[in-house]
Amino acid sequence: MTAITLQDITIHAVVEQQGPFFDVKEFFPTLTKEQFDENRAWLQPTFIDANGGVILCVQSFLIKTPRHNILIDSCVGNHKPRPTRPFWNMMDSDRFEKGLVAAGVTVGDIDYVMCTHLHGDHVGWNTRLENGRWVATFPKAKYVMADRELAYWTQKENDDPSGFPWITDSVLPIVDAKRAQIVKSDFVLNESIQFIPTPGHRIDHYSVLVGRPGHDASITGDMIHSPIQGKYPELGMRADYDSRQAGQTRRKVFDRFCDTSTVMCVVHFPSPSTGRVRPWGDGYKFVA
């Protein structure tokens, strides 16, 4: 994606990987054959490959303002044991760090890491392995997490310490080091960085509204994974906490930004991952 300029703010994509990680029927369990066939022509090959794999990007968005460098989500990370996800298991890649450098920053320049939610592909670079310990990757950053989301996963990890490795290696070390800033999902950092509560995919998910009216962008997190969920906003995906609520959230957000100049920066859309919301029948589409 080409950097987006919003007056004195720029947004850069920092891509870790992209590929067809899940079968479309597995990823969207309620997607009907009729719905898929009706939309196959525009979905393939950009969003779904010839074998039915949903093409997803795993990336962060870097926001550069006059005052702060802010990273939204932190991908999968290196050396993280993810045995149920072979494409993420024990990664050892310099692509993410090179992406930061290409955008003009290093890990030491990041002031905030904002975790839209605490799934493993959004928190991985929170930490890095150093002498057998998980330490903060971004040495001066505050890590911003929604309070109910953190409480939910902390309890899960307490109940089953081996069952949620991304919490063990990428979230709790940040909390234990007192680097976490725990907030409500309607948190406002300043006049140009504010959260939008977007629950459903997670119990306490947030998106990030960047910029000022008429010159703004919404960084979605996992409010949406594929543009087929624009066409069918009620279409849930396999990892939703509450698919019904997620569908209601999508409609509410798309209604808010439809036919406006707001740029949607969608974490999991294949590159370039951005578009503006426009009406499309009973749903919505994304246009450049």
What are these regions (language model features)?
Residues 1-105, 109-121, 128, 137-197, 215-221, ...:
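Metallo-beta-lactamase
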Residues 16-17, 74-77, 118, 148-149, ...:
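Active-site metal-binding loops of divalent metal-dependent hydrolases
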Residues 59-63, 205-210:
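Short beta-strand scaffold segments in enzyme catalytic cores
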Residues 87-98, 213-288:
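Cap/insert and terminal regions of metallo-dependent hydrolase folds
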Residues 123-133, 276-277:
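Metal-dependent catalytic neighborhoods of phosphoester/phosphodiester hydrolases
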Residues 123-125, 194-206:
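Active-site glycine- and acidic-residue-rich loops that bind
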